[in-house]
Design a protein with these regions (language model features):
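Short small-residue beta-strand/loop micro-motif enriched in glycine and branched aliphatics
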Residues: 114-119, 172, 197
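Mobile genetic element proteins and their domesticated derivatives, centered on retroelements
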Residues: 6, 27, 95, 108, ...
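Conserved short alpha-helical interface segments
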Residues: 1-62
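RNase H-like two-metal-ion nuclease catalytic core shared by retroviral integrases
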Residues: 150-166, 172-193, 202-214
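Mobile-element integrase/transposase regions
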Residues: 47-106
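C-terminal domain-tail junction helix/linker
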Residues: 197-241
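Coil-to-beta-strand transition motifs
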Residues: 102-103, 111-116
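Active-site beta-loop-alpha junctions of metal-dependent nucleic acid enzymes
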Residues: 98-101, 118-142
């Protein structure tokens, strides 16, 4: 958690306990100045990141994988306003995160709640990715299976099969436009704190990936008024039962 998340969560969950009121600046200064030599550099680096990176429209990832002409792909510009304004659960953004030795994981983030799912992949070919996504979405409640926004990578060439199997509509971003999946891009930056570049992702089990996702889903977010993604999504699903 960042100092801002700690401070905001305490204000929200302990409103009557004034002794627990503490500003982000106080937390940061205490950790940084009193324990600077004891703290590992990586921890300091994470403290400095009080929020995830915001990528501008000209930002592209180094080594961006090639795009293809997706057959019968629906462009992102045809998404409904309800998806764009984050009013309902079940609209996801997704992408692949790559490691060494040709290893990959798939990441999914719900646009409204910021709830994160991380999937182990056998490969980044369209068959492997389609199977992993299909299995996961079919395990979700129907109210969480509405749409998926992805980039134009060849791993989702079988998107029509995925939609037929799950009922989830797929929208494709414009080429070289990662900001159109900004929520997913920012979440991937958080995931990289657990799985740095030059890490072989194949060494991790699905259970280990689930534990990382659970940490992210139990982390309060300023954009959610310091509620957690898990709280938001569980409350939303409960209201539809």
């Amino acid at each position: 958690w960042s100092p801002e998340q700690i401070s905001g969560w305490l204000r929200r969950t302990k409103p009557r306990q004034k002794t627990l009121r503490i500003s982000p600046e106080t937390i940061y200064k205490t950790l940084y100045f009193r324990s600077r030599e004891a703290l590992h550099h990586l921890n300091i680096q994470h403290l400095q990141r009080s929020h995830s990176l915001r990528h501008g429209r000209r930002h592209t990832r180094k080594g961006e994988r090639g795009t293809i002409n997706i057959v019968n792909g629906t462009p992102i510009h045809e998404r409904s306003r309800n998806i764009d304004n984050r009013r309902s659960l079940g609209h996801w953004e997704g992408d692949l995160v790559s490691g060494t030795k040709n290893s990959h994981i798939a990441t999914l983030v719900d646009r409204k709640s910021r709830y994160t799912i991380i999937l182990r992949l056998r490969g980044k070919d369209s068959v492997s990715v389609n199977q992993a996504l299909t299995d996961k979405f079919l395990s979700l409640p129907s109210e969480l299976r509405k749409s998926l926004t992805w980039d134009r990578g060849m791993e989702l060439a079988r998107h029509l099969e995925f939609t037929v199997s799950t009922g989830v509509k797929v929208y494709f971003c414009d080429p070289q436009s990662p900001w159109q999946r900004g929520t997913n891009e920012n979440t991937n930056e958080l995931i990289r704190q657990y799985f740095p570049k030059k890490t072989c992702l194949a060494q991790y089990t699905q259970h280990e990936l689930d534990l990382v996702a659970a940490q992210l889903n139990n982390r309060p977010r300023k954009t959610l008024k310091f509620k957690t993604p898990k709280e938001i999504i569980e409350r939303g699903v409960a209201l539809t039962d």
